[in-house]
C-alpha cells in the first residue's frame, strides 16, 4: 500500500509539472505573437497617418493623434518585452532548479556505482587471496628435542617412515607374541639334509605383514625345504640355559627401553616431512 501511494504521488507531481510547463510555453508563444502583431500594427499606423496627413486639412490634429499613438505603441512594446523577459527568466530558473536536481541525482548514482565497483574489486582480490596456499613452514625444520644442531629434511622420508612404522608395529604387538618370541629365541631346530651338506645357507620365512618385523639373530630358523620332517629341538644344559635367558632378557629390555624413547619422535618427524613434501 505504501509503495502504491508513493507511486501515485510521484505520478501526480509529474503530471502537475508537465501541465505547468505546457502553460508557460503557451504564454511565451502568445507574447511572441503579440510582438509580431505589434510590428504589423505600427507599420499600418504609419501608413495611415502618412496618407491622412497629405489629404486632411487639419494637419495639427493628425500630428497630435500620431504622437499619442506612437507613445502608446512604445509603451505596449516595452510592456510586451518586459513580460517576455520575465517569463523567460522564470522558465530558466525553474529549469535550472530541475537541472540541478537531476545533476545531483546523477552524481549520487555515479558515486554508488563507483562504490559498488570498488567493493566488487576488493571482494575479488580477497577471494583470490583465499585461493592461494602459502607455506607455513620452512623446507628444513629444526627439532630441538634431539639436539639443536640436528635437522630433518624431506630427503630421508621413506627410511625414517618405515623405521617408525616398524617400531609402532612392534610396540602394538600383543603380549602373547612377545612371549613367544622371547621363549622361542632359546630353542634351535637342527638343519638336516639327505643329499646336501650343512653348509647351505638358510632363508628366513617371509612375514605376512607389509613391513617385516624386526627379529633378533637368536629367533627360530626354518629349513628351506618344507618337506623335511621336523625333529624335537635340542635341549641346552640347565646352567647354560639360565645364563642365556637372563642375558637375553636384559638385552631385550635395554633395547626396548631405548627404542621406545625415539619411536614417537620418529613417527612425528616422518609425518611432518610427508606433509611438507606434499605442500
Swiss-Prot record:
Residues 192-211, 219-241 are annotated as: Disordered. Keywords: Cytoplasm, Cytoskeleton. One of its GO terms (cellular component) is cytoplasm. It comes from the Eukaryota. Its main location: cytoplasm. InterPro entries: ABI. Residues 219-228 have a biased composition (Low complexity). Residues 194-208 have a biased composition (Polar residues). It is found in: Cytoplasm, Cytoskeleton. Belongs to the ABI family. Binds SCAR. Involved in regulation of actin and microtubule organization. Part of a WAVE complex that activates the Arp2/3 complex. This is Protein ABIL4.
Amino acid at each position: 500500500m505504501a509503495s502504491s501511494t508513493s507511486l501515485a504521488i510521484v505520478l501526480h507531481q509529474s503530471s502537475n509539472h508537465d501541465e505547468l510547463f505546457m502553460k508557460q510555453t503557451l504564454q511565451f508563444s502568445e507574447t511572441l505573437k503579440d510582438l509580431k502583431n505589434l510590428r504589423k500594427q505600427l507599420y499600418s499606423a504609419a501608413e495611415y497617418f502618412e496618407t491622412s496627413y497629405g489629404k486632411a486639412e487639419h494637419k495639427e490634429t493628425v500630428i497630435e493623434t500620431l504622437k499619442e499613438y506612437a507613445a502608446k505603441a512604445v509603451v505596449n512594446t516595452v510592456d510586451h518585452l518586459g513580460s517576455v523577459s520575465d517569463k523567460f527568466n522564470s522558465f530558466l530558473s525553474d529549469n535550472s532548479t530541475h537541472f540541478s536536481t537531476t545533476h545531483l541525482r546523477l552524481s549520487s548514482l555515479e558515486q554508488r556505482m563507483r562504490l559498488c565497483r570498488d567493493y566488487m574489486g576488493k571482494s575479488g582480490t580477497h577471494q583470490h587471496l583465499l585461493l592461494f596456499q602459502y607455506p607455513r613452514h620452512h623446507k628444513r625444520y629444526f627439532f630441538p628435542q634431539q639436539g639443536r644442531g640436528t635437522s630433518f629434511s624431506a630427503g630421508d622420508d621413506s627410511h625414517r617412515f618405515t623405521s617408525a612404522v616398524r617400531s609402532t608395529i612392534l610396540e602394538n604387538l600383543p603380549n602373547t607374541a612377545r612371549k613367544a618370541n622371547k621363549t622361542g629365541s632359546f630353542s634351535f631346530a637342527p638343519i638336516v639334509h639327505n643329499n646336501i651338506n650343512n653348509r647351505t645357507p638358510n632363508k628366513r620365512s617371509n612375514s605376512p605383514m607389509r613391513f617385516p618385523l624386526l627379529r633378533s639373530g637368536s629367533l627360530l630358523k626354518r629349513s628351506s625345504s618344507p618337506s623335511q620332517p621336523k625333529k624335537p629341538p635340542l635341549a641346552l644344559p640347565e646352567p647354560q640355559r639360565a645364563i642365556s635367558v637372563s642375558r637375553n632378557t636384559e638385552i631385550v629390555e635395554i633395547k626396548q627401553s631405548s627404542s621406545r624413547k625415539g619411536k614417537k619422535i620418529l613417527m612425528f618427524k616422518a609425518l611432518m616431512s610427508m606433509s611438507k613434501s606434499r605442500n
